Amino acid sequence: MSDRVQRLAQLQDLELMIREVEDPASKMKEEALGFSVEGLAQLQNARSRLLKQIPKQDLRAYQRIRRKYDRAVVPVMNRICLGCFQALPTSVTRNVSEAGPLPICENCGRILYWL
Amino acid sequence: MTAERLLSYFGESRFVPELRSRSKDGVLGEMARVLADEGEIGDPALLLEMIRRRESLGSTGLGKGVAVPHGRSTAATDTRIVFALSKKGVDFGALDNEPCRLFFLIVAPYEDRKHEYLPLLGKIVEVVSDEAVRERLLQVDSFGAFTQTIREAFGE
Ligand SMILES: [Zn+2]
């Protein structure tokens, strides 16, 4: 797993959790089951800290894709992109160098996260 | 939701008859590793981070010895439940400060097309709200005994 993709996946999970905590309907459903859901501020702090660890160009790519899709980072299973369910060409690999391009699905443009 | 439907999220390889860990963080790690070991999760570290973060919003120890850690992760492709027991009990920071003995880890993918995540969470909470069911679950020593107990809880 590339650290660069891993951090973007972390950011995505964190932003999803923030969205759920911010959504009164989803928060109420969990609370009705007996769970406590507090601490939006600490999630936002964690997000700020994480943002500082992500290279600027990776963050820009992530945010650009997030404007188009709900998920910017999607898992790859059996060489299928689980964002658009198309097979990936063999030229796409899980190996990501520190400075090279992020692994992107040619078909939908999402960032690929190898399981 | 039928018993069969609920049981479809569990599995023999996701049944832990006795947890080794004695701490909350250890239990979360041990249960996340179960999913990683069966190839359900690519990266247990990513999953674990999400579960720990969810716990920071409030313990999922619901009281009466039951904990239901849960969350959605980019590392998950399908909704899965790990069921684990700790006969000695683990301090999970539960609302009633009682040690937890019954653990259900629910992990769902980021995109929940079938909208199964919250109803599933609700069903688990409902099943374990019955004291007799909790007592029987504490005694199960095999996955078969577990599924039998769940079916009985549904009156089947
Ligand atoms: Zn794609």
Residue ranges and their predicted role:
Chain B
Residues 1-156:
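Cytosolic covalent-transfer regions centered on His/Cys nucleophiles
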